[in-house]
Amino acid sequence: MNQLANRPKILIICDYYLPGFESGGALRTLANMVDRLGDHFDFRFITRDHDGTMVRASYTNVRINEWNRVGNANVFYLSKDRVRSSVLRKLIDEVSPDAIYLNSFFSRLTVFVLTLVKLRRVNPVPIILAPEGEFSAGALSLKSVKKRFYIRQARSLRLLGKIVWKAASESEKNEIEKVLGKNLNILVAPNMPPGIIFENYEQAKKPLKAVGEARMIFLSRFMRKKNFNWLLEPLRSIKGGLSIDICGTLEDADYWQECRRIVETMPSNIKINTKGPIPHENVLATLVNYHFFILPSLGENFGHVFLEAMSSGCPLIISDRTPWRNLQQKGIGWDLPLETPGSWVNVLSKCVNMTNEEYGRLSHRARRFAVEWLRSPSLEESNMHVLEFALNSGSGH
């Protein structure tokens, strides 16, 4: 008990946390980190009182503007009128953390924290910043003028100090350095997954794969970065029956209308349906009903959903702009260049024409790969190293 009482306090300040689910992988990373490292660190959260950018209603199952016990962490949910620098300052003083962890570079909460630290309005404390893919070319191309302006301002005002940066992969490390320069403390640790995904999985529950048909799922927040509109043109060339269900929050209504207009012109053998957001506890039971997972994303720093898909026996059909590479050599899917739509047509046609036996082998390998990857002890070790490195670095400001 004494050991638990002496754990270093890590204050995580983020836009969204449990019981939410619509903000996707960034939220899952935090929840998994708390679950797996909660015996080593005393996690506290300051977060908003609602779920994602599309849902503005406050949670009804937590106490707002008070501390709540959520799993292995204490969580303070800010009402909209209390998302202010002065409120953050008081809460940081109250917690008196050993380190602060931020999971977005562009969040208003991050701006508040970095400004408070720079102006010495709070006690000096190490800052860990995990930008969660925000520096990928695809992500930066969206609202690029606003983002570039903020990057220039942050540098000129010297808000970045001696931050400890957490990248989920070597490719994300390179993206951060390309934008902010190489003179940074960047540590690489994969985003924290759960210890096992879909423990009671049964291969027999997968749907039969008939030659000439395939069921695919696009499970993601629906936004321009996920690049669904790009996929529609290659789909026109596919012979045979192909259905794609879009599962996730339609975060960009204008973008969805653009896509919908194209969807309405698709040939009759291509079926595209929208299913809306899926609560996280239902994700695996949903994924297992599909043959393949598809996502032509402009960039992902990690992609929890890829692990969930493979754990559900769904081979991946994704762009080559994620850390999950060489999938074809591993026999668990395909990572394809967006520059060559023809390669997507070839793979999609192959999937449609695959026999049940061929599909079963591919599905089994995808599941086995995910299970073995999740067992790696280096996942916890590398994430603990990031937190311990920051704690041992002193205030850093």
Regions found by a protein language model. Give the residues of each.
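N-terminal subdomain of nucleotide-sugar transferases
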Residues: M1-S58, E66, H397
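A conserved mid-protein helix/loop that constitutes part of the nucleotide-sugar donor-binding site
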Residues: R28-A31, A214, F218-S237, D254-Q257
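Glycosyltransferase donor-sugar binding loop
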Residues: R48-T53, P193, L219, S243-R260, ...
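Nucleotide-activated donor-binding/catalytic signature segment of Leloir-type glycosyltransferases, i.e.
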Residues: N74, W256-E281
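Membrane-proximal helix-turn-helix segments that form the acceptor-binding/catalytic region
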Residues: K147-W165
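Aromatic "clamp/platform" in nucleotide-sugar-dependent glycosyltransferases that forms part
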Residues: L298
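Short hydrophobic beta-strand element within catalytic cores of glycosyltransferases
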Residues: P315-S319
